Each structure stands twice: as structure tokens, then as C-alpha cells.
A protein has these predicted regions:
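Short hydrophobic beta-strand element within catalytic cores of glycosyltransferases
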Residues: 323-326, 333
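Short His-centered aromatic/hydrophobic patch
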Residues: 118-123
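Nucleotide-activated donor-binding/catalytic signature segment of Leloir-type glycosyltransferases, i.e.
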Residues: 269-286
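Aromatic "clamp/platform" in nucleotide-sugar-dependent glycosyltransferases that forms part
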Residues: 306
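Short alpha-helical donor nucleotide-sugar binding micro-motif in glycosyltransferases
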Residues: 285, 293-298
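Carbohydrate-associated surface elements
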Residues: 177, 197
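Conserved donor-binding/catalytic core segment of Leloir-type glycosyltransferases
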Residues: 6, 219-235, 241-244, 258
Length: 396
């Protein structure tokens, strides 16, 4: 009898960024090597009425029942944010009791599964309640901000996260660095490391393909330096104009600078690019399906983020043959090497631009770590599940 796994995560179907893509990669890779029936559910929180007015949020233009991404059907679970929760949390630091009730009610939909795999905090609440009600093993995957940002900035979230870390059959973390951050919250939890990996579509094209692609995009006779990600403060994107300008000064050759992504700070960054006089192109929000071809044109990826868990974007860039430099945050060195990450101090912009210019000037080997493989991660995930499934009766 085929075992059934439910994968639950929180996301936004209109914004497919790192965590969203990491979940899909895990599902696709596990399906490829193991005979599981895997169903995927996404929690999308929405505002309406008083909550939308207070948060100045924009309502979703539509609320689909399901979407499909990379051949994976995702059933949508739409959960309304409560204005009582928002007020109680804002004024008194209270737990969101209405939201928690709505999440726990969703657990009834998971009663027939053998395993529930949840990604980050909201999904973990659903999975934990399902495990308590129906007795199946539950696994929580942690990707970044839900460990190193939210619990640090909010006492209520810290208490909640500590409870969740202690509760599942096992926690999965995307890096050793993220485990160290979690241990700052509590030393007591079970865990395994499941590194992010680049899916097969992210690979280095042939020399002929790359030449045709670069010619079509107008960068056949120059180097390309890029940033890929959201345009918001935690990403330090306002530093990009200065970083790119210094790279242009330090490299003796033509350089074009690209950005891929969107966010409320993009206009500020564009003005900085205009003032610096660099040659640039801002692609805006790029469909994930197109990222492999753009990365195959990139020579160096720059990631100055203030905080990152284990940035999937750097792994995808390396898989396509680009070099990568980044700020020395939670786990960036695990993916791109200690020599290519730099402390966020007064010398950061000078240091990261110098390393990027060096990479443009001469070949620097920067191999993708063997462990950063979707296949390797799927193999390990399957082995962990099998240890627990062998203890369960069929059709429990």
C-alpha cells in the first residue's frame, strides 16, 4: 500500500520566492525517488474589512481553490487574519487565538495521512494538531526568517517558536547555521539537516547555447553582474548602486548590471543606478521558469542581504556556472565558501566589490557543494521517513 504524505506550507501564490521554490523542489525530488502519494497544501493568509484597512493591505484579486507549479498541484487553504488578533498582539503582545483556532481546525483534513511535513510556523501549528489528534509522525522544516528574525523581534513569536521546535517528531533545517540560531532560542529539540539544492533545470548550458543566449540579450561582449531577490530593507538593496559602481571602477572592461526581483525599494535603487552612471537593466519580477537562462548569462551574483537562512538563489547561480559573493550571514558561507562572504562592517562594500571584480578578471573555481543537491536531500529525507514509517501499521 502506498504511503500518503501531506506537505503543508505558508505562501503567496503570486510571489514565488526562495521558500516557496524550496518546498516545490523538495516535493518534486522526493516523488522522483520514492513511491509516495504526496499532496501539497498552501496556507495563504488574507485580510478583509477592518484588518485590511488597518494593515493597508491589498486584497487578492481572486482566491483560487488550487494552482499548479512545476507539475505539482497545490490545494489552497485560505485563512482570514483576525482583527481581534491583530489588535491584541499589537496592544498587549497576545497570542493570535482566533488564527490558531482556524489553523487547528484545518488539521481534520489531514487525518488520513501517514506523515505530515510542514514548512515554517503557521503550517507547523496545523501539523502539530494533526499529530496530536491522529498520531502520525510530523516533521517541521525551517527555512530562515521564522528562526533568525521573527522570534528575535517578537516575544510572543519567540514563545510560540520554542514550543514548536520541541514538539515534532523531528525538525528539518536548511543549514548548520540555522541550527545554531535555533539553539539560541532553545537547546532542546530533535533535528536533521536537509540542505537546499538546485533543481535539474538549473545547470550550465553548453558554450554554444550560452553564446546564443548572451547574443540575444545583448551581453555577448561584456560581463554581467547581477542581484536576484526582493527589494526590501533586509536585503540591503540600497547598497547595490554603490557596490555596482565600485565593481565598474575596479574591473578593466565593460560590465552590465542586472537585477531580478521586485519590491517597494526598487524605485530608490533605480535612482541610485541612474546617479552612478552604470550600464544596467532591471528585469523586475521574473518567472521562475526563466531564471536558469538568465543565470546562464550571469558572471557574478551579488547578495548583500543582512539576513539569509541558506540562500537558494546562490546555489541556483552556482549550478548555472556563475560565481557568487555575499554578506557573511547565518549560512551563506556553507553554500558559496568562506572566501566569498564578507562581514557587514564599514569595509563591506569595498571588500565585496573587490572580490566580484577579481572574479570578473580571472577564473575562480567555485564548485557547488556536493551536499547541495535535490537528489541528495530527497534521499536523506526518504531515509528519515522510512525509519518512522516502518514503525507504523499500514493504513493506521
Amino acid at each position: 500500500m502506498t504511503r500518503k504524505i501531506a506537505v503543508v506550507f505558508e505562501g503567496n501564490y503570486t510571489n514565488r520566492y526562495g521558500g516557496f521554490n524550496a518546498v516545490i523542489n523538495r516535493v518534486v525530488s522526493l516523488r522522483a525517488i520514492a513511491d509516495y502519494a504526496i499532496d501539497v497544501y498552501m496556507i495563504q493568509v488574507y485580510d478583509k474589512g477592518l484588518t485590511r484597512l488597518r494593515r493597508e493591505s491589498t486584497p487578492a484579486s481572486e482566491r483560487p481553490a488550487a494552482i499548479e507549479v512545476e507539475g505539482v498541484k497545490i490545494v489552497m487553504w485560505w485563512v482570514e487574519r483576525s482583527w481581534l488578533d491583530s489588535l491584541g498582539h499589537r496592544m498587549l503582545g497576545l497570542s493570535p487565538t482566533v488564527m490558531l483556532g482556524r489553523l487547528r481546525a484545518l488539521s481534520a483534513r489531514l487525518r488520513d495521512y501517514d506523515i505530515v511535513s510542514a514548512h515554517d510556523r503557521l503550517a507547523a501549528h496545523v501539523a502539530l494538531e494533526a499529530g496530536r489528534r491522529y498520531g502520525m509522525p510530523v516533521f517541521f522544516s525551517w527555512h530562515g526568517a521564522s528562526i533568525y528574525t521573527d522570534p528575535v523581534e517578537d516575544r510572543m513569536i519567540r514563545r510560540c517558536t520554542v514550543e514548536l521546535l520541541k514538539s515534532p517528531t523531528c525538525n528539518f533545517f536548511v543549514s548548520e547555521g540555522l541550527v545554531r540560531e535555533a539553539h539560541k532560542l532553545t537547546p532542546h529539540f530533535k533535528y536533521e539537516i536537509l540542505l537546499n539544492g538546485a533543481p535539474p533545470q538549473f545547470h550550465r548550458y553548453s558554450a554554444a547555447e550560452r553564446h546564443r543566449l548572451r547574443s540575444r540579450l545583448g551581453v555577448e561582449d561584456c560581463k554581467v553582474v547581477a542581484y536576484a531577490g526582493r527589494f526590501e530593507p533586509v536585503k540591503n538593496v540600497l547598497w547595490l548602486p554603490d557596490i555596482f559602481h565600485r565593481i565598474a571602477l575596479k574591473y578593466d572592461g565593460r560590465v552590465v548590471f542586472w537585477t531580478m526581483g521586485s519590491g517597494w525599494q526598487s524605485d530608490h535603487v533605480k535612482r541610485g543606478f541612474d546617479d552612478s552612471g552604470i550600464d544596467y537593466k532591471m528585469w523586475g519580477k521574473v518567472a521562475p521558469e526563466r531564471m536558469p537562462e538568465l543565470f546562464n548569462c550571469v558572471d557574478v551574483l551579488v547578495l548583500p542581504s543582512r539576513l539569509e537562512g541558506f540562500p537558494l538563489v546562490t546555489i541556483e547561480a552556482l549550478a548555472c556556472g556563475a560565481n557568487a559573493v555575499a554578506a557573511d550571514t547565518v549560512s551563506t558561507a556553507e553554500g558559496i565558501g568562506r572566501d566569498n562572504v564578507f562581514v557587514l562592517d564599514d569595509d563591506f562594500i569595498d571588500n565585496i566589490s573587490s572580490r566580484a571584480a577579481e572574479m570578473l578578471a580571472r577564473h575562480i573555481d567555485q564548485p557547488l557543494p556536493e551536499a547541495c543537491s535535490c537528489a541528495a536531500t530527497a534521499k536523506k529525507e526518504n531515509e528519515i521517513y522510512q525509519r518512522y514509517l516502518t514503525k507504523l501499521p499500514k493504513n493506521q
